Amino acid sequence: ADLEAEAALLEVLRPTGLPILSEEMGADASFSLDRDGWIIDPLDGTMNFVRGIPVSCTCVALWRGGHPVLGVIQENGRDCVWTGGVGRPTSCNGSTVQCGNASVPESAILTTGFPRCFDFGDASLSETMRRLSQYKKVRMIGCAGLALAWTAGGMMDLYREENIFLWDAAAGIALVEAAGGHATFTPIDGQWRTTVTAGSPSLVAAEH
């Protein structure tokens, strides 16, 4: 399914002439984070999809000037399409949405996840539990794209994940920012991994 979705996306995006970074095929030779390009994840939440859990999506982001400026996420389980970016307020199936305005962790829902390369050593786990314990609720849905889309829609208050791939997060970052939220991330060219904090401006500020 992921390869079929990628083929369909490439058929649409190739005519634009912009280089592409995709989870499945990797990066075009000309793709660079300091140039315009597309970043796509044909199927985010693959394990959920394989196991029949209706929490997966397709993510497409337009990257410009070192930042995602447009995001589109097709939510498979609910047949919802999220769109948003610079000059385009975030919407879900055409209805405008906004980030939540939670100002303190004690009243907020955090959505997060553990990447496959997560450090499960004592020090890392202790710091992670300290961070998670601040929040009223914590949700791990196994799909970064939807976690960010749901944060943009106010269903979650903050998304934070370390060492996440750009193709998992780029579209969602654009959605959060276009919904009035803030996002911080520092991508590394050639590695395509970053740590993302996105959602309520007050909560993002509190994490830094």
Residue ranges and their predicted role:
Residues P19, L70, I109, D157-L158:
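Short, Asp-centered acidic motifs that coordinate Mg2+ and/or phosphate
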Residues V60-L148, T194-H208:
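Acidic beta-strand-loop-alpha-helix segment within the catalytic core
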Residues S126-R130, L146-H208:
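Oxyanion/phosphate-interacting regions
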Residues A1-L43:
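N-terminal subdomain of lithium-sensitive/metallo-dependent phosphomonoesterases centered on the IMPase/IPPase/PAP
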Residues F49-G52, M140-I141, I164:
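Short glycine/threonine-rich catalytic loop with a Thr-x-Gly-x-Asp
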Residues D2, L13, T46, E75, ...:
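Residue-level signal for inorganic ion chemistry
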Residues D34-G77:
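Glycine-rich active-site/cofactor-binding loop and its immediate structural neighborhood
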